[in-house]
């Protein structure tokens, strides 16, 4: 089985990771851990003014943070016997997850129900809602915290 795991620093992402460890067979499962780094804009940009990107150093720092998060997740999965890979991609997490599921020919895409933004939609977060609608494979949304 090929699984794509959407991962960030939210408790729901950790719950999704733990779901894999509890429910999948390591010898039969390849997990690709995906985290996306949005290119942020300054909070002070005027509505009609062009967005001002953050300095490269800040984007690199955020990218390193995502890489460290994914490395810890990878270590946990490998200790449990899973074959893993990591992708930290620039851009929107919704598109990064759907595209990775497509290119990796995933059988299952797993995400937590809400990400680190803490801005819930009606039932699911915006990333979960998007991947449920657009992923080329089955999607598991983990709601229960580990």
Where are these regions (language model features)?
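Glycine-rich, Arg-bearing micro-motifs that act as flexible, cationic patches
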Residues: 108-133
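General small-molecule cofactor/ligand-binding pocket signal
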Residues: 32-34, 85-89, 140
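Small/aliphatic-rich secondary-structure junction motif
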Residues: 1-54, 82
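Structural beta-alpha unit
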Residues: 75-109, 146
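A short acidic, glycine-rich active-site loop
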Residues: 52-68
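Short secondary-structure boundary segments
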Residues: 35, 112-114, 144
């Amino acid at each position: 089985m090929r699984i794509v795991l959407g991962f960030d620093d939210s408790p729901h992402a950790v719950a999704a990771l733990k779901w894999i460890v509890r429910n999948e067979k390591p010898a039969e499962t390849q997990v690709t851990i995906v985290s996306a780094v949005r290119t942020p804009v300054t909070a002070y940009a005027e509505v009609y003014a062009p967005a001002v990107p953050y300095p490269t150093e800040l984007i690199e720092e955020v990218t390193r943070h995502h890489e460290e998060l994914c490395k810890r997740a990878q270590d946990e999965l490998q200790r449990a016997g899973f074959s893993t890979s990591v992708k930290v991609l620039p851009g929107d997490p919704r598109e990064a997850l759907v595209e990775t599921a497509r290119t990796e020919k995933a059988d299952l895409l797993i995400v937590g129900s809400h990400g680190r933004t803490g801005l819930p939609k009606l039932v699911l977060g915006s990333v979960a809602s998007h991947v449920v609608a657009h992923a080329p494979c089955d999607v598991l949304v983990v709601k229960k915290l580990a």
